């Protein structure tokens, strides 16, 4: 059981904070993790999209149209990159304000979770002890059978398998009993935790705190929208000439094709 708990802990540690331990860096914030994931995702899309554009431009039709799609694609990538740089601090400020405004709720829930954890810990320790006892019981039963297999070689393999079946069923039934007992012991605490959460939400709904939080969230969103407008306008101005050039090229090609067809 300790190995299972340790494995899960290592999994989460490796997935979130381990690299900061080895690098001696400060742990990433929630916004930093989201930003890193989004950056990797967008970069992957840009790289794969550029490959498709390059393939089309190399085709006969692409060479005939001469749209310079790869150059335009790189221009779009550069413009979007500038947009990300401009919006990064604004968005980070939004998340920071949001986290500050919800600190009180997280603190209340953490207190309840810590209290429940202390109450259920004896049941978890008891379950771990029972688990270890059953594993030792299982090893004692299986050990002699393994020795017989080594001595009797292959002809006794089928007999060994038949003798292992009831042992496996026995350990399964015994562990199922312990799991059911643990579930029964923890059930009241799960219900209590749900009740406390419902009480917190009801209290939040009836208090002025929720109205204040809604106002703050609305203000944060409004601020984010206002600060993002210049960056979005820069993006629009950067893309407009490229789109107009693209449209003019396509229309010219259509007119030329129509003239050729009409003269035939």
From Swiss-Prot:
Any one of the GO BP annotations: cholesterol efflux
Keywords: Cholesterol metabolism, Glycoprotein, HDL, Lipid metabolism, Lipid transport, Lipoprotein, Oxidation, Palmitate, Phosphoprotein, Repeat, Secreted, Signal, Steroid metabolism, Sterol metabolism, Transport
InterPro entries: ApoA_E, Apolipoprotein_A1/A4/E
Subcellular location per the Swiss-Prot or TrEMBL entry: Secreted
Signal peptide segment: 1-18
Keyword Repeat: yes
Membrane-crossing residue ranges in chain numbering: none
Methionine sulfoxide: residues bearing it: 109, 193, 242
A GO CC term assigned to this protein in UniProt: chylomicron
Sequence repeat start-end pairs: 67-88, 89-110, 111-121, 122-143, 144-165, 166-187, 188-207, 208-229, 230-240, 241-264
Renumbered residue ranges of the record's region 10 X approximate tandem repeats: 67-264
Family label: Belongs to the apolipoprotein A1/A4/E family.
Name the record gives this protein: Apolipoprotein A-I
Gene source species: Peromyscus maniculatus bairdii (Prairie deer mouse)
